[in-house]
UniProtKB/Swiss-Prot annotation:
Gene Ontology terms, MF aspect: serine-type endopeptidase activity; signaling receptor binding
Protein's name in the database: Plasminogen
Domain spans labelled Kringle: 80-146, 159-217
Function (record text): Plasmin dissolves the fibrin of blood clots and acts as a proteolytic factor in a variety of other processes including embryonic development, tissue remodeling, tumor invasion, and inflammation.
The organism of origin for this protein: Petromyzon marinus
EC number(s) given by UniProt: 3.4.21.7
SMART domains per the UniProt record, alphabetical: KR
Localization terms from the record: Secreted
GO biological process: blood coagulation; fibrinolysis; proteolysis; tissue remodeling
Superkingdom of the organism of origin: Eukaryota
Intrachain S-S bonds: C81-C146, C102-C135, C124-C141, C188-C212
Pfam families given in the database record: Kringle (PF00051)
Swiss-Prot/TrEMBL catalytic activity: Preferential cleavage: Lys-|-Xaa > Arg-|-Xaa, higher selectivity than trypsin. Converts fibrin into soluble products
Length: 325
């Protein structure tokens, strides 16, 4: 029979004692004939009060939470990020968003470990369909989402230094990622659709992958033909043409008007500009050039007032004593 007057709280086998008022994990059911010799207690080991064949886990590792979900199986497993609500996440993140360490999943024993859920160590998981992977603490886990806006997965420029000036190293990711991910040398890439953009492994063996300092393209659109204003590229070309006639008049000018035949083959070009009409009487004619020097009033940037027709038809050169139009 139990020896009255003892208040021992640890059993002979170094298991925490179950409270006498508790029915978990053992429902009290004993008699004088079945009691062990000496002071005893029900332990938190599921195998029994006096069993040494199954060690079990300490009862304090079952706190502060007990599992209440039912096991299920999920497809589409991921390790680096979260798809949807993360039921298939099998990575090794084990901290909450505020940096709290996760409680070990094995602390749910006695009970089913639910191996189909990948409940390993204290890594973040989502076995019950919560909105994000979680662990037994009070917060959701800090795991990046697999979906979102542009992530730089198509970035293939040759840029190696990471954001904190570490040098990238070559890492064999080809067997794990898409064959067209551009994983050559040690250049910055984003083969896993990381929402923070291109990254690389560094030469520091103790450091995690580093994100690269790559400029992002924001805004802008392709310029359409005849749109105003627009930028164009002027490139040199060479043609051999025949001169039909030369007009050197009026006297006093330093250029001549040359007529060629057949006409030169030119590329169509539309230029939008602005300038001062200075009494020409036409919205498509404006004066350019200062004989005294200075800034030309004609600019190839569309500012106010803009000319109505954005087409430069021709240039008229007059003698030096007249105004150039």
């Amino acid at each position: 029979a139990p020896i009255k007057g003892y208040s021992v709280t640890v059993x002979l086998y170094i298991f925490d004692c179950q409270k006498w008022s508790s029915n978990y994990p053992h429902k009290p059911n004993f008699s004088d004939a079945t009691d062990p010799k000496g002071p005893w207690c029900y332990t938190t080991d599921y195998x029994g009060a006096a069993s040494v064949t199954r060690s079990g886990l300490r009862g304090d590792e079952q706190t502060p939470h007990r599992h209440t979900f039912s096991p299920q199986s999920f497809a589409g497993l991921t390790t680096a990020c979260v798809k949807g609500t993360g039921e298939g996440y099998r990575g090794t993140a084990a901290l909450t968003v505020s940096g709290k360490a996760c409680q070990a999943w094995a602390s749910q024993t006695p009970g089913d470990v639910y191996s189909c859920q990948g409940l390993v160590s204290n890594y973040c998981r989502n076995p019950d369909g919560e909105k994000l992977p979680w662990c037994y603490t009070t917060e959701y886990c800090n795991v990046p989402s697999c979906t979102g806006g542009p992530t730089g997965s198509e970035y293939h420029e040759i840029l190696t230094p990471a954001q904190d000036x570490y040098t990238g190293i070559v890492e064999d990711y080809r067997g794990k990622m898409s064959p067209d991910a551009g994983l050559e040398e040690n250049f910055c890439r984003n083969p896993d659709q990381d929402p923070q953009g291109p990254w690389c492994y560094t030469x520091n063996p103790e450091a995690x992958p580093r994100y690269c300092d790559v400029l992002s393209v924001v805004g802008g659109x392709e310029a359409q033909r005849n749109s105003x204003p627009r930028q164009i590229s002027l490139q040199y070309g060479w043609q051999t043409v025949h001169v039909q006639s030369i007009h050197a008049e009026p006297r006093g000018v330093d250029i001549a008007l040359v007529k060629i035949a057949p006409p030169a083959q030119l590329t169509a070009c539309v230029i939008t500009x602005w300038g001062e009409t200075q009494g020409t009487g036409e919205d498509v004619q404006f004066c350019a050039g200062y004989p005294e020097g200075g800034t030309d009033p004609v600019s190839l940037v569309c500012l106010e007032p803009c000319v109505l027709a954005p087409v430069l038809v021709g240039v008229v050169i007059l003698p030096x004593n007249d105004r150039x139009q």
